[in-house]
Swiss-Prot record:
One GO cellular component term noted in the UniProt record for this chain: membrane
Transmembrane annotation, as ranges: 1391-1411, 1442-1462
SUPFAM superfamilies: Oligoxyloglucan reducing end-specific cellobiohydrolase
GO biological process: Golgi to endosome transport; Golgi to vacuole transport; protein targeting to vacuole
Subcellular compartments: Golgi apparatus, trans-Golgi network membrane; Prevacuolar compartment membrane
Membrane topology of this protein: Multi-pass membrane protein
Full protein name: Vacuolar protein sorting/targeting protein 10
Top-level taxon of the source organism: Eukaryota
Organism expressing this protein natively: Fusarium vanettenii (strain ATCC MYA-4622 / CBS 123669 / FGSC 9596 / NRRL 45880 / 77-13-4) (Fusarium solani subsp. pisi)
Amino acid sequence: MMRSVAWAALSWRVFWLSLLWTAVSAKQDKPKIDSVMLEHPPLNLNYFEDSDVIVFQDIEERNIYRSEDAGFTWNKVKELPDGGSAFLYLHPFESSTAFVLTKDRKHYKTEDRGKSWTEFDSGSMPSAFQPDTLIFHAGDPKRIIFNGMNCDGIFCDEETTYTLDGFKTIQPLRPSTSGCWWAKSNTEFTTGDEDLDKTRILCIVTDPLSIFKTSQKLCVSDTFFKKENNGKYQEFEPTLDSNRDVTGVVSLAAVKSFILVASSSANSDEMALYVTSNANQWHRAMFPSDDSHDHSHQINQEAYTVLESTNYSIQIDVMTSHPSRPMGVIFTSNSNGTYFTENIPYTNRNIKGHVDFEKISGIQGIFLVNTVENGKDVDEGSAEKVVVTQITFDDGRTFEPVKAGDQRIHLHSMTQINNIGRIFSSPAPGLVMGNGNTGKSLGKFDDSNLYVSDDAGVTWKQALEGPHKYEFGDSGTILVAVRDSAKEDVDKVSYSLNYGDTWESVPLPKDLKIRPALLTTTQDSTSLKFLLIGEHDKRYHMVALDFEALEKSTCGDKDMESWNARVDDKGQATCIMGRKQTYKRRTKKADCFIKSNFKDPEPINEPCDCTDADFECDYNFQRDPEDRTVCKRVGSIPMPQGACKDKDDKFKGSSGWRMIPGNQCKRTKGAQKDDEVERKCSEGGGGNSGGDGSSPSVPANGEISHKKNDFDSEALDMQKYYLIRGDSSSGTDETIIARPIGERTGNSVQVENKVWLTSDHGKSWKRILDQEDIMKIFHHDYFKDVMFFSTKTDKILYTIDRGQTFHSFKTPVASDDFTLSFHPDKKDWLIWVGKHCDDVSGSKSCFPAASISTDRGDHWKTLVRYATKCEFTGNSAYKYRPLTQIVCLVHQEENLESPKTIVTINDFLADDKLIHNGTVASFATMNEFILATDEVTEAGKEKAGLQAIASLDGQHFEAAQFPYNFHDSHSSLYTVLDSSNHAVNLFVATDLSDGRRRGSIIKSNSNGTTYVLSASNVNSDEAGYVDFEKVAGLEGVTLINVVANPDKKDGKKEIQTKISHNDGAEWDFLPPPSKDVDGKAYKCSSAGDSKCALHLHHYTERDNKRRTFSASKAIGLIFGVGNVGSTLGEMKDADTFMSADGGINWKNVKKGAWTWQYGDQGSIIVLAERATHGNGAKTKTVSYSLDEGETWNEYEFTDKEVTILDLTSVKTGAARNFLVWCRSDSKQLFSVNIDFTGLTDKACEYKDDASASDYELWSPKHPLQKNDCFFGHVAKYLRKKKDRKCFNKATLSLLHGYENCECTRRDFECAYNYELDNHGQCSLVPGFQPLSGEEWCKQNPNETTWFEPTGYRRLPLTTCKDGVELDKTSDEHACEGYEDEFKRKHRTSGWVIFFAVVIPIGLAAAIGWYVWRNWSGKFGQIRLGDNSSTFDSDQPWIKYPVIAISAVAAVAAAMPLVIISLWRSATGVYERVSNRSRGGNWSRRYTTRDSFARSDYSMVDDDEGELLGEESDEEV
């Protein structure tokens, strides 16, 4: 705050100085200088363009200050409400206009550079989720998009509005957006149509059925998303990628004449970038092959930076190194932004993503870059960075050292920025300054000196000693510098009037000494006035300088010279980027000022004839190191669509050269260097393939092929780990890691220390890590192309690029097991829990400790001591807890003998923690739920019991509410089943006797507060596994096995299979086929009842727990092994059955028990007769179908019968390659790749004309409904027609659309304390009466109304509207005290929701997670109530109540296709808005009521060898 004393002093000072000025003006030889003191730092300081008017934001006061005289005097803007200014925006396309936004809907605007302000209403608050609230139209300054949010309570819904008249009026845009932009957001951009330039808007649109970022898409409208009569919006989804439908759009950026869109996908953090130069045609940004480089070319989230680009090309720096040693590669695109070529590797970056790169302003083709000279050694972790500075004069084609005389100099750049604005240059022609040093490499900043160049970086000279902040004025005739210091010891400002040859200084006024913060002037560097801001004694000083006081004359023609941007040795102008560029600037010795205020220097350009210097290597070509005149091919050449139908064909392709983008040379007659030449098809590739991964590399021959590979091993079997790609991946490899295993002993398995890797799905294998002693192999829990390998020491190996390279780190403390925890959004964030041991005076003691790393293990710090378990609970999808939140199970009082409790840590700070008030046995996370068991003492009992507690926000834990009398007949053994469908499915054991294990499945409501019975007598085994599995890709379809004879205490269990088509609300028997595969009728027939049905062997009987009935991309296909009858028979008598319609109809396809795999989205099915314990089958063929099981063919893959150990493929069912794992009679282990890509090379196409389309639309059905409504909507999926000879693109989006339906009985399930009776109706649980309204309101004190109970509640999955709403009656009543609110039709308060849901978030019982790594590597169990020694892992699990995971395979498979994403782009909330540079302190809010109530369910992946491949967790 500016104190009145300061203003009074300033007024008197101005008065006396004015008198003195009259007396001494004739003798003034120094610039005018004065200062004003501030209480708070002036943030967001901006000049209004072409003026001396400056405004800044006082972030503490929340006020705006303004100066009309370049900073000599300041006044608070009084027309704005005191303390209400949250954001300050200057209009980028209207120099006199600015906006001040508040935290509310009322905002302010000026159109006269801040002299006057008018109020306007935006209709919503500024968005907390978008980086920019105001999006300006570059062609019409009155057109503005307002990205806002509507917050009635603690929940905020994003909403977007727009104005066409500068906020005189405002209109809503489309709902369900995550940011909108004008296509013409830059002056350089155009659609090519003036009308479209005015109206075209691009929005990232969210999916109403999903809140995941990976379901978002890009929509375009030219009519402001006008809503039609049918309720649809006038919009279209642009074809971003010609090979696939693109979802997962997370960001959009306008870059000069281009628009960039980034998309992400599950399983990987690789990004796909799409580029357009007209908002009509889009292309995926294609980066060259990295096969011939020692660094990657992959684009990952938070690992690329779009550099300062031009109208004709995009430049991107891609981080290719370890995050703690950041380095990158600069790429430059061609003229349409599609094909990128590498400029220079090993650029110097910092962890914030800043790159040491800057173009020289106003001169084309010149930029300075810092590179790491020993980049390869640094990347391998064996050296510190040696940073050197280089300069290019041909836009990155060649680079030269920067020299001052004969000495090389190195300059500090963006990674050590010490001022605002550009680093080295300004619009002043040819003038460049920088802090640096001479020598072999860049030194410390404090040891640098100031250097200056007046010929655009060709030659340099030292200007001043020590590091400085600097600025340019009067088009370069004035250079101003102030020494950069961390101390408050700077008392002068230096300046030069002859391009840095000589320097003078002026003292700061009033003997002031400061620590300089910034030095600035007008954006165009034409002004004679400068502003210095510094700190002294915790106060801030605005020091203004004015060189007009020197009273220099205005330069005339005799004072000016023609300066050539590039000259030869003789000083003659030479060509740069195809033209000679000349500026008019003042001669060095002229004693005058140009005084062309606010007028940018204009160059004179003269084109040159094209030469070899105007060309560079094209996409996937690079310079031959032995002959720099040759560009050699290092990757496939893009070829025209439809080329190379025959392998002997040729096509016209790149010569290897392209003109440097932006080069303006004049082509001469005759052949051109970049003319296309004839190429062999073997040299070509898919061009803009988009990483489809399914396009064949050679033309199809109509045949299936196979290739065998022997393994040098005497083991019995192989572990397999598929590295799953995301849809945004640019690669096409199908990578698998395998190693031999031997006999199993209990929970352990013998392994050989040999590891193989294949990148072509088993066609070729290579040994890897043969010098390492590998113990265990693990996937990253969320990024499936990242693998970790533990060793016998503290060394952990890993790969982040699918096995191309391997790196390592050391664990901070020892551990008995692999105890890494992973963050769902941040690939490099790790938690390690291990033993910390001290040896003091011969006394050794150990305690558990958790450590954290944010750079993938390079550096560790202790997170919390005496912690036995920690997990990242922060997730960008869960807005109600911070991204940095961690929950740990910790011994109280740092004593191993003390009970454990939950500790919640925010921001990785052990001091910032919340300790749960209670004794906790254990905890687990499942999607958005944090679940635990609290030890409590029941009334009248001395022994403590276990109480289920849970939380959504990680801070407030409350008990769950089970059905009435539920615990009277149930044990405390719990198993968490798949909880992906907006609710927790919990198995609770009822019978724990040997051979009779069974229990009940209970299901929570959508916010997890209460549970109802879903199914009784569900089968389980002694390991805690349950016969429960959701059908992959189909919403709410679940298969279970139940015990048909629960009352018989002796004898064998009789098992029956049931299916639910409405998420467990109702269960039916599987209808049996009438005939078997041989056409013979079964002994019984029915529509599926207790006497006759199809029964399938389920999860508890599987040798390989990774097996599932279905695959996520083979929608509606289900395979199983079983029999027709009253109950399930023996496995030896089982046959193989399938359904093609989601389990409604079944048929027998094979006699005997066969294993299956899906391929090509279900259009390929492969069956193999696998050997089991009861069946030592041998064969030399597999069976396959290309028409969804209607017909079957045999394929012989070996000439002798062998034992098939396994049949595998990519788990999603999208690949066209399969692997058969075999053992010969001679005990030789081998694999056989079976490749179906040769059958066709034609990609299937969807067309609106059903007869011409290769696809038909298929909708899942409920067997008891006449229409196709399924969970309140008709979903339409693409299915390839059975007779079409084409392949499905691997990234094909199967969900084609959906329409909501009216509600029916199938959209409801039984409410709390109700259960299905024998008539299929929801009846009260015996012994319980419905709550009265008074009781309901008393038990729910924050509710305002109550409905008379109906016994039904709405299914969390359903989207139905209106119709039969069984959860409501016609009678709604107000709770006492809320009558007035009820009369106002009761608008639910956000705070009511907060106290009713967030804080008392009563939830599930003691619930488990999918892997318990701290007990002998046994998969699928975590121990609850375990008070034994921390490191004692050999106790039998039966001794304690246990949570086990069952059918985790189904967890991954059951994710509904419409919400199948794991990876989200982080959505920011205001913790401190100052992080956005516009200031403000905002409370954190939830995004939507729906996202809170139903929350954000992520997929627990069952990737092979990790979650379900128990081999990966076995003892070695």
